[in-house]
Amino acid sequence: MSARCERTATGVRTVRDGRILWNLEIDTPECRPFFHPLNFPSGRTITDLRPADHIWHLAAWFSWKRINGVLYWEPADKELRGVAPEGETRVVRQEIDVGGDAACDVRLELEYGPRGEKPVVAEKRTIRVSAPKATGEYSITIDHVFTALADVTFDRTPPHGDVSKGRWGGGYAGFTLRLDPEIAKEFTVHGLSVGDSPATCTGKETRGLVFTLPKTGETLRFSQLDAPETARFYIWPDKRMVNPSPVFTGPYGLEKGKTLHLAYRLDVNVCQGT
């Protein structure tokens, strides 16, 4: 089995035996980098890009919901068809290092600010993708360091609904996975500290989740490595959206000059425990 990591016109990807294993888009219409596709070594795609119900969902991406009341998550137009929220996310610098073993390091600098105005938050993001194992398994580690350029408050739509009745929403922000609907149906989910369903994990799980395909044993492990005390996992009832929101339980304030560190890891495995 051979694998190579290569630059593309808009980002970087790893190809294994002629098939894309993972692809990172940096230069995007939304100005928000995202991974798509993320594939199992078998070739099955995990992620869903710009689904019709939420065209601003970008497979595996990071987006704040609100900063100082300004919306960064979804389009600003009432029809929710545009790509431009009220707040701008801007990639201002990128550096990509490709290893001969098909590993990859990406360093990004981003800014966040109201559209057409000065930025209020700066970010340094480091993305490390491991060289795939002989089996094709790989891991992605994403490290975010946010620096407040003014006093800021990161916020979300407050959680609402009743998980006991199978209907809930709100609380989301930050790094998010939008899962392919067919694979989401098949996945079982298990919390690393609590819960074994979307209802029992949402608002409670803090460490991570393991998604498993029972028929094949393939697993996706989504770990939260560093986050504030306000962070909790949020999962749609049908598992199509997964988000370790740093502001699930409440807003997070950051004074000018202060920093916030967030870190996550995705492990794509051919069988549980590998």
What function would you assign to each model-found segment?
Residues 29-81, 188-205, 211:
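Extracellular/lumen-exposed scaffold segments
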Residues 1-59, 156-158, 215-217, 273:
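Beta-strand-rich N-terminal accessory domains
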Residues 216-274:
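Beta-strand-rich recognition/accessory modules
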Residues 151-227:
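Active-site/ligand-binding surface loops and adjacent short beta/alpha elements
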Residues 99, 129-139, 154, 164-166, ...:
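Short, solvent-exposed beta-strand/turn "edge" segments of beta-rich domains on protein surfaces
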Residues 110-114, 127-133, 146-150, 160, ...:
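Beta-strand elements of well-folded, non-transmembrane domains
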Residues 12-18, 140-148:
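Short, well-ordered beta-strand segments enriched in hydrophobic/aromatic residues
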Residues 61-136:
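Extended, loop-rich substrate-binding clefts of extracytoplasmic carbohydrate-active enzymes
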